[in-house]
Amino acid sequence: MLEILMSLTAAICWAFNGIAYRKGVKDVSAFTANFHRTLFATVYFLPLALRDFPGVVIDLQTALVLVISAMLSFYIGDLSYFASLKRSPVSIALPASSTYPVYVVLLSTVIYGAELSLNALISAILVFVAVYIIYGSGEKGETSGLFYALLAAFSWALAILTLDFLTDRLPVSIVAFVRLLLCLILLSFTAKKDELSTEIRLFFRSVRGIFLLLGIMLFITAIKVSSSWNVVQPSSTSPVFAAIFGAIFLKERISFRLVAGIFVIILAILLLLLPPLQ
């Protein structure tokens, strides 16, 4: 129960992150905005990492998995998602990329030998359905847009599965800080140099970093307490919360699609709390 709540709270934090982006830093590219957000989050994580670092030993295998995890999540995954958005509308890119919980549940049986839970699998599918209900509008885009969205989902799924391995060997703060630091280095090559010195509202940059820190900390802790395939579903509901917060804070229209999507998300979360289906 606790890990489900932590994962759900992480999704809420990431949704607020999106609202902060749309409210205060949307005048720069997504790459530069992510660079600023990651920079602040890395700085925020530094004291926690320094506190937990004494006595920590990172062997070669763990270091390699850390690098792979950061590249899959923040570089290959995010870049593929942005490539998808360039080639197809949000109504295609977002639902397709939201299939990553399904991959996590299925791949966990191969990578970790986990038992396939019907509750977890159906819950993951329901999350995808909810995102599709809200954002899917039947618009058409390039086939490559769909491919990049699915590639992003697959990359994110693999990155999430590495967290089970990493949290067994390292404190949560170290895992989060090192991954963010590696991400920051990678983003420094893709952020637009002429935008790095652009005057953006400092408040919104710092707020995005705070929400990123809270979301990552809660999600990785949830994985450490349980396992990725049991907690990934609530964390992937951030697009639904983003739509809700958009209606509340940005005065966006509340549609029947949004209400229906919320109902499906509630079913998905309840399914994780029910006894296992046979």
UniProtKB/Swiss-Prot annotation:
Q: Which UniProt key words apply to this protein?
A: Cell membrane, Membrane, Repeat, Transmembrane, Transmembrane helix, Transport
- Pfam short name (any one): EamA
Q: Which InterPro entries match?
A: EamA_dom (IPR000620)
How is it placed in the membrane, per its record? Multi-pass membrane protein
Q: Where in the cell is it found?
A: Cell membrane
Segments traversing the membrane: 1-21, 30-50, 56-76, 92-112, 116-136, 146-166, 170-190, 209-229, 230-250, 258-278
Instruction: List residues of the EamA domain.
Output: 12-136, 154-274
Give the UniProt entry's GO cellular component terms.
plasma membrane
The record's similarity note reads: Belongs to the EamA transporter family.
Protein name, per record: Uncharacterized transporter AF_1533
